UniProtKB/Swiss-Prot annotation:
SUPFAM superfamilies: P-loop containing nucleoside triphosphate hydrolases. Pathway: One-carbon metabolism; tetrahydrofolate interconversion. Homodimer. It holds the Pfam family FTHFS. It comes from Arabidopsis thaliana (Mouse-ear cress). ATP binds at residues 78-85. This is Formate--tetrahydrofolate ligase. GO terms for molecular function: ATP binding; copper ion binding; formate-tetrahydrofolate ligase activity.
Length: 634
């Protein structure tokens, strides 16, 4: 066993998450780094229990062979969640503390909005958590704050540019963009050459431009109706979903309707998650499209001259944050993109660094948001395309509770007591719901990976119900199916899962297969994904048709697709449980995160700014003023 890992003594019943987290004294993060053989030159400390791992750590280990790569998805969940994060952490505790393997957990950074709202935190649960969990769930090392700042700088640049273009002639605008120096000479800043190149202007001096070229260069002529970029903040605030800006007396009546999204919905978060280097991040940030000109041309952050400044604000955020689990295994926390309008996976750079750190025979386990129809699909078709990495094993987390729901059980509603059907034995209801599990197994196997079903056991589950899930999983083609009790028993409760994962990784026989090639049309890619859901066809609204035509004309049809749909059904209708088929998938709109690198069709209506419930989680949260420890965080 490594020097940093430990085995917990557990008690029953399982205490509250925050009480368990506070009962374990974390190791100084330098001890975790030392156990991973990270040179102190390659990380920066953020207090005692967090460190930023620098990209230079990857550069130093480039010759090192990668470890095994494992992704954790799940069946179609209930609104309560089925424990993917807890299973991810529990598995890694089993691999590191009980099976003596080198392992790194790679997780998304949670938004503080849901932490204070209805969902609570995302550090795992019970005896399988990331600690300190209050630091994990709140500010961490400031990455989300950096995203908020850079996103809003770009938003300010957009409206400011419209304002100044409205009130100035072409010549006056150009003269202010390229002011003379003390010697009276004008010059272009470095970022301006990006726009000149885009316009096909090869001249290097402002004095050489013709009046027509001056107009093309200086006047972006942004169509306000086309602007898709919104301001963000990391708080659930429903009253900011739709606002009017520009109502001050100095703005000369230039009002515009817009709104706020939650920070993790920003395209900059998706860029952070999909970037592979600082240079790559600079290019992606500069290519972000904020809207169109009145002539229909895409306007980018680099056109506004702000791409470099955005990168400067994000320069520290590109480095993953090192933390630890309750049992002392290492965790890299990095990026937290939405799983609907974005791809819902932690960062590529964290995974790449982790795979080098664990080396041959080690394990990197990462979680994909929502069910495997969404999270694992996007992991394979978007994240793995850009990273060039290939997973050997995919886990599908299932619960008896969710399977009963898919078998026809009563609705599961967050905040309400569970119906008796979910806390008493009903094997036939479980078996009926296994059609959902079978669909997730077959979909995931199609990528060429070995699939393991991890049955996340609850105290009310019976042996007969658990055995039914295991049998059905094996009959459906799973490599293995394992019952886990890591929530109640820490890594010890996931040892069998760890053994199964090792066997699955050692016995991979197929290459990674994508669901679709990139060189087909946008509609063809959408329809390939819809078919994997069980749809018989796709129906496009007039708006969706218009957007697909626009993105194709603008040269973006070769990007992967990031479907934005409900996580509560394979279909577009959250009420359709099990494995619905033969439905027509409606595409309401199609939008693009061009800098991040994907097109996202909207299936139904998606909120990008959550609201607070009547009784938010913040009612439970307080601080012990004597010890400084947080109470009530979950």
């Amino acid at each position: 066993m490594s020097s940093s890992t430990r085995k917990l003594e557990v008690v029953s019943p399982v205490p509250a998450d925050i009480d368990i987290a506070n009962s374990v004294e974390p190791l100084h993060i330098s001890e975790i780094a030392k156990d991973l053989n990270i040179n102190p030159l390659h990380y920066d400390l953020y207090g005692k229990y967090k460190a930023k791992v620098l990209l230079s750590a990857f550069d130093e280990l480039q010759g090192q062979e990668d470890g095994y790569y494992v992704v954790v998805g799940g069946i179609t969940p209930t609104p309560l969640g089925e424990g993917k994060s807890t299973t991810t952490v529990g598995l890694c505790q089993a691999l590191g503390a009980y099976l003596d393997k080198k392992v790194v957990t790679c997780l998304r950074q949670p938004s503080q909005g849901p932490t204070f709202g209805i969902k609570g935190g995302a550090a795992g649960g019970g005896y399988s958590q990331v600690i300190p969990m209050d630091e994990f769930n709140l500010h961490l090392t400031g990455d989300i704050h950096a995203i908020t700042a850079s996103n809003n700088l770009l938003a300010a640049a957009i409206d400011t540019r419209i304002f100044h273009e409205t009130s100035q002639s072409d010549k006056a605008l150009f003269n202010r963009l390229c002011p003379p120096n003390k010697e009276g000479k004008r010059s272009f800043s470095d970022i301006m050459f990006r726009r000149l190149t885009k316009l096909g202007i090869s001249k290097t001096s402002p004095e050489e431009l013709t009046p027509e070229e001056i107009k093309k260069f200086a006047r972006l002529d942004i169509d306000p109706a086309s602007i898709t970029w919104r301001r963000v903040m990391d708080v659930n605030d429903r009253f900011l979903r739709k606002i009017t800006i520009g109502q001050g007396p100095e703005e000369k009546g230039m009002t515009r309707e817009t709104g706020f999204d939650i920070s993790v919905a920003s395209e900059i978060m998706a860029v952070l998650a999909l970037t592979t280097s600082l240079g790559d991040m600079r290019e992606r940030l500069g290519k972000m499209v904020i809207g169109n000109s009145k002539a229909g041309d895409p306007i980018t952050a680099d056109d506004l001259g702000v791409g470099g400044a955005l990168t400067v604000l994000m320069k520290d955020a590109i480095n993953p944050t090192l933390m630890q689990t309750l049992e002392g295994t290492p965790v890299l926390v990095h990026a937290g993109p939405f799983a609907n309008i974005a791809h819902g996976n932690s960062s590529i750079v964290a995974d790449k660094i982790a795979l080098k750190l664990v080396g041959p025979g080690g394990f990197v386990v990462t979680e994909a948001g929502f069910g495997s129809d969404i999270g694992t699909e996007k992991f394979m078709n978007i994240k793995c395309r850009y990273s060039g990495l290939t997973p050997q094993c995919a886990i599908v987390v299932a619960t008896v509770r969710a399977l009963k729901m898919h078998g026809g059980g009563p609705d599961v509603v967050a905040g309400r007591p569970l119906d008796r059907a979910y806390v008493s034995e009903n094997v036939s209801l479980v078996e009926a719901g296994c059609v959902n599990l079978a669909k997730h197994i077959s979909n995931t196997k199609a990528y060429g990976v070995n699939v393991i079903v991890a049955v996340n056991m609850f105290a009310t589950d019976t042996e007969a119900e658990l055995n039914a899930v295991r049998k059905f999983s094996m009959d459906a083609g799973a490599f293995d199916a394992v019952v886990c009790s890591h929530h109640a028993h820490s890594g010890k409760g996931a040892v069998d899962l760890g053994i199964a994962v090792e066997k699955a990784c050692q016995n991979i026989t197929q290459p990674l297969r994508f669901l679709y090639p990139l060189d087909i049309g946008i509609k063809d890619k959408i329809e390939a994904i819809a078919k994997s859901y069980g749809a018989s066809g796709v129906e496009y609204s007039d708006q969706a048709e218009k957007q697909i035509e626009m993105y194709t004309q603008q040269g973006f049809s070769n990007l992967p697709i990031c479907m934005s749909k409900t996580q509560y059904s394979f279909s577009h209708d959250a009420s359709k449980k099990g494995a619905p088929s033969g439905f027509v998938l409606p595409i309401r709109d199609v939008r693009g995160s061009i800098g991040a690198g994907f097109i996202y069709p909207l299936v139904g209506t998606m909120s990008t700014m959550p609201g607070l419930p009547t009784r938010p989680c913040f009612y439970e949260i307080d601080i012990d003023t004597e010890t400084g420890k947080v109470r009530g965080l979950s």
